[in-house]
C-alpha cells in the first residue's frame, strides 16, 4: 500500500493515494493515443486508496478521479470530471492550457457554488508518469562543504545557458545544458561552491500570462513537489527528465560543487477559490489547504498567491517532508532554500519557530544533514522574521541587502548598521547562540534589480510585464549614478563599474555566506525590470557575449572569491570579539575600527549621521579555531577601507603594533594597477566611492584552514 505515489518494482506498479473525503477513487491509465482506462481503487486503511497493476512499465501516464462531496461552502471540492495529478508523481507530462474544463465552477457564474462544472479536463491538463527509480550513481557523494566555506550562486536553469554559445543548441536551457562541462568549469573557475537553482519542481504556466504572450519564468507556482520541471528536460517528459536531473547533480558533485534547490512548499499552483482544480483541491481540499475559519470556501493566504498549505495537517507535513527526503536520498541534492519560509511556521495565526515543521526537520536524520536556508518572511501579519529561525537554519538576510545598498548610495546614519552587517550581523543572530553562517548575505537576487541595474536605474521599468509598471518593488534603494539607464557618458559608466566592484567587495569580504545572483559577475541587465518573473526571453537570460568591461568585472569578482576562500579570517566560523571598555590599550583585538586619521573610532564617530567612511583591522593571528590538520588557525592580517563619500579621503594606516608592512591587494578605483606596499603610519588615498584592501606582509606561521 505504501509508499504513496506510483512505485515501479520491475514487475508492475503500485499506486497509492491519500484522501480522507473520497467516496470512490479511479486510477486512470492513458495509452499512446490518449485512450483512458479507468480502474477503481480500494481504500485499505488510514484513507489510503490502493491498486497494484502488474505488467505496467516506466513511462506509463496516469491520473486520478476522486468521487466525493462537492460543497465549496464547507471546503469540499471533489469533482470526478477533473483528472488530477498524483501529489507524489515523480514525473509529469505536459502543462495546462487555461481551458474552462480545468475549473470546478462555470466561468459564466463563478459565484454559484452549487453549480459544479462537469466538463472533463483530461485533454487540457498535465498527466503523471511512472518512472524507473534505478540510476547508476557510481560513487557519487554529497560534497558536504562547510557553511563558512560556501559561496552560493543563484541560477536559473533556462536563463543560465539559453544564450551560451559554448553549449550545444539542443540542450541549452535544460538540466543537460547546466551540466555541460564548460558551464561547470566556468563556475568552478569563478570559485563557486554551490549552485542554488530557482524552482525546478514541476510548476504551472498560468493562463493569464499565456494570454499576454508571457510565461511563469521564475517558477514559484509548484504543482508537483517530487517531479523535476519537464520543460527543462532535453530528453523527454515521461521520466527522462528525472535521469537528466540526476546526471546534472552527479556532474556537479564530480566537480566538488553542491546543488541547492529553491523550493516552494508554502502554496501550490491551484490558487484561490477561483483557481483551477489540478490535484490537491480535488483530492482532499481541507487536508492540504488552510481555509478561512467560518468561511471555508475561501483560502487563508499569507503568500500572495491565493492559498497556503495547512501546516498543522499531518498529511500536508508528510507531503513536504517526504518530498524533502526524496530530493536528498533519490536525487542527491545538497540543500534547500525555502521560499516564504515564515508561512511554514504558521500552525495557527502567528509565526512560531517551535512549530511542528521545524521540530520534524530538526529530528529528521536525512533532512537535518543538508543545508537549510530560509527566506525569512511572508506576506502575513508578523511575517518578517529575519533572525527568528532555529539554530540549524541559515537565512537570506534582507537587512544586509538594504544596508549595503544604502551605504554605497551615501544614505545618512548607515555606518553603524553597515559595520554590523559586515561582521556577520551578530545583533540578529548571536543572541540565540547562532553563528555568522546564519546570515546568507546578498545584495541582489532574482527578485529585484540585477547588480548592473542597481547602479543604472533609480526607477523600475516593468512595462514589458503588461501591468502598467505597477508591479514590482518601488523602493529599490538604487542609484543610477546621474543618468537613468544606458549612457555613453564615460564618467557615469566608470562610476557604475566602480559601484559594482564596491558592492562585490563588500559582499565577499563580509562574514557569513555570500550569495551572488547569477549573471551579476558579468554585469547582466534586465533593462530596469525589477520583477522579471514572466520574462522567459533576453530580458532575463544571461548574455555571455562579454565586452572588455564585463570581462574585467568577471576577473575581479573571481579574484575576490578566491581571496575570501584562501583566508579564514575573511570567513570565520565565529563572530569577532572587539575591544571592550577597560581592556589593555596595548592588546590587539580580533577586530578594530579606525577613522581616517588612524584613531580608534569613538561614540561620536559612530553617531555621526554623515559619516560614510571607516577603516577596519582584522586580526588573522587571533582566530580561536583549529584547521583540518588540528593546528590553530593563523592567517594574514587585513585592513579594509570603505569610502562612500563623493570625495577622496586620505587614511592614515594604524601604527606598527597592528603590522609593519602592508600590501595593497584590492582597489576598486584602480582594479588593474600593480600591488603597492605601505608601512605602518603611512597615508593612503581612498578615492571617492571606493574600497581598499591591504594584507599584512607577514606569512602565517602555521597552516591555514581549508
Where are these regions (language model features)?
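Carbohydrate-interacting/catalytic domains
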Residues: 1-153, 158, 487, 492-497, ...
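Conserved, mostly hydrophobic/aromatic
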Residues: 17, 64, 155, 197, ...
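Short, flexible loop/turn elements at secondary-structure junctions
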Residues: 21, 43-45, 55-57, 68, ...
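Core domains of carbohydrate- and sulfate-ester-processing enzymes
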Residues: 68-137, 206-221, 275-300, 415, ...
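Short catalytic/ligand-binding loop motif for oxyanion handling, primarily in non-cytosolic enzymes
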Residues: 71-75, 161-163, 203-207, 267-270, ...
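Substrate-binding/active-site clefts of carbohydrate-active enzymes
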Residues: 121, 156-332, 340-363, 383, ...
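Hydrophobic faces of well-ordered beta-strands that scaffold small-molecule active sites
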Residues: 151-153, 195, 259-261, 336, ...
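Conserved alpha/beta catalytic core and glycan-binding cleft of carbohydrate-active enzymes
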Residues: 353-518, 523, 531-535, 568-575, ...
Amino acid at each position: 500500500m505504501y509508499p504513496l505515489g506510483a512505485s515501479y518494482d520491475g514487475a508492475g506498479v503500485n499506486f497509492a493515494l491519500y484522501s480522507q473525503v473520497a467516496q470512490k477513487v479511479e486510477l486512470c491509465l492513458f495509452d499512446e493515443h490518449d485512450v483512458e482506462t479507468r480502474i477503481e481503487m480500494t481504500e485499505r486503511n488510514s484513507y489510503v486508496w490502493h491498486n497494484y497493476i502488474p505488467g505496467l512499465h516506466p513511462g506509463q501516464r496516469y491520473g486520478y478521479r476522486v468521487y466525493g462531496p462537492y460543497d465549496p461552502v464547507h471546503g469540499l471540492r471533489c469533482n470526478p470530471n477533473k483528472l488530477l495529478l498524483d501529489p507524489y508523481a515523480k514525473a509529469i507530462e505536459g502543462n495546462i492550457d487555461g481551458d474552462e474544463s480545468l475549473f470546478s465552477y462555470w466561468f459564466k457564474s463563478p459565484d454559484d457554488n452549487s453549480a459544479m462544472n462537469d466538463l472533463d479536463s483530461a485533454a487540457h491538463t498535465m498527466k503523471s508518469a511512472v518512472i524507473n527509480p534505478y540510476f547508476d550513481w557510481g560513487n557519487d557523494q554529497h560534497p558536504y562543504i562547510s557553511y563558512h566555506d560556501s559561496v552560493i550562486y543563484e541560477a536559473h536553469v533556462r536563463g543560465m545557458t539559453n544564450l551560451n554559445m559554448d553549449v550545444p543548441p539542443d540542450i541549452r536551457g535544460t538540466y543537460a545544458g547546466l551540466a555541460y562541462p564548460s558551464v561547470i568549469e566556468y563556475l568552478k573557475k569563478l570559485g563557486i561552491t554551490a549552485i542554488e537553482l530557482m524552482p525546478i519542481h514541476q510548476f504551472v504556466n498560468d493562463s493569464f500570462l499565456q494570454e499576454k504572450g508571457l510565461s511563469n519564468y521564475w517558477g514559484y507556482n509548484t504543482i508537483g513537489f517530487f517531479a523535476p520541471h519537464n520543460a527543462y528536460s532535453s530528453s523527454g517528459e515521461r521520466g527522462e527528465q528525472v535521469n537528466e536531473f540526476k546526471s546534472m547533480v552527479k556532474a556537479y558533485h564530480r566537480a566538488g560543487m553542491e546543488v541547492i534547490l529553491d523550493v516552494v512548499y508554502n502554496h501550490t499552483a491551484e490558487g484561490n477559490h477561483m483557481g483551477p482544480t489540478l490535484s490537491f483541491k480535488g483530492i482532499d481540499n481541507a487536508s492540504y489547504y488552510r481555509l478561512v475559519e467560518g468561511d471555508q470556501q475561501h483560502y487563508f493566504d499569507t503568500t500572495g498567491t491565493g492559498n497556503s498549505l495547512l501546516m498543522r495537517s499531518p498529511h500536508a507535513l508528510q507531503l513536504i517532508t517526504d518530498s524533502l527526503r526524496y530530493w536528498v536520498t533519490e536525487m542527491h541534492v545538497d540543500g534547500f532554500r525555502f521560499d516564504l519560509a515564515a508561512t511554514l511556521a504558521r500552525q495557527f495565526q502567528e509565526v512560531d519557530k517551535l512549530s511542528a515543521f521545524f521540530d520534524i526537520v530538526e529530528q529528521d536524520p536525512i533532512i537535518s544533514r543538508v543545508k537549510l536556508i530560509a527566506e525569512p518572511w511572508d506576506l502575513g501579519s508578523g511575517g518578517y522574521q529575519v533572525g527568528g529561525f532555529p539554530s540549524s537554519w541559515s537565512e537570506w538576510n534582507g537587512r544586509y541587502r538594504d544596508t549595503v545598498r544604502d551605504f554605497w548610495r551615501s544614505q545618512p546614519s548607515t555606518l553603524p548598521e553597515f559595520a554590523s552587517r559586515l561582521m556577520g550581523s551578530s545583533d540578529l543572530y548571536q543572541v540565540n547562540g547562532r553563528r555568522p553562517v546564519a546570515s546568507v548575505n546578498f545584495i541582489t537576487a532574482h527578485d529585484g534589480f540585477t547588480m548592473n541595474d542597481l547602479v543604472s536605474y533609480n526607477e523600475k521599468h516593468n512595462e514589458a510585464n503588461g501591468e502598467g509598471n505597477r508591479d514590482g518593488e518601488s523602493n529599490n534603494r538604487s542609484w543610477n549614478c546621474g543618468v537613468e539607464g544606458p549612457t555613453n557618458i564615460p564618467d557615469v559608466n566608470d562610476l557604475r563599474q566602480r559601484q559594482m566592484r564596491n558592492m562585490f567587495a563588500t559582499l565577499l569580504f563580509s562574514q557569513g555566506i555570500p550569495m551572488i545572483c547569477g549573471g551579476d559577475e558579468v554585469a547582466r541587465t534586465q533593462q530596469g525590470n525589477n520583477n522579471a518573473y514572466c520574462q522567459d526571453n533576453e530580458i532575463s537570460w544571461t548574455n555571455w557575449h562579454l565586452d572588455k568591461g564585463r570581462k574585467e568585472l568577471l576577473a575581479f569578482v573571481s579574484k575576490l572569491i578566491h581571496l575570501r576562500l584562501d583566508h579564514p579570517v575573511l570567513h570565520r566560523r565565529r563572530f569577532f570579539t572587539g575591544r571592550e571598555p577597560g581592556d589593555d590599550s596595548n592588546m590587539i583585538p580580533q577586530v578594530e575600527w579606525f577613522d581616517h586619521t588612524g584613531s580608534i573610532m569613538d561614540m561620536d564617530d559612530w553617531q555621526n549621521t554623515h559619516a560614510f567612511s571607516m577603516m577596519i583591522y582584522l586580526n588573522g593571528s587571533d582566530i580561536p579555531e583549529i584547521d583540518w590538520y588540528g593546528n590553530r588557525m593563523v592567517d594574514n592580517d587585513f585592513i579594509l577601507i570603505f569610502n562612500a563619500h563623493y570625495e577622496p579621503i586620505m587614511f592614515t594606516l594604524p601604527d606598527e603594533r597592528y603590522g609593519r608592512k602592508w600590501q595593497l591587494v584590492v582597489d576598486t578605483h584602480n582594479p588593474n594597477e600593480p600591488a603597492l606596499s605601505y608601512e605602518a603610519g603611512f597615508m593612503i588615498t581612498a578615492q571617492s566611492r571606493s574600497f581598499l584592501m591591504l594584507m599584512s606582509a607577514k606569512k602565517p606561521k602555521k597552516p591555514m584552514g581549508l
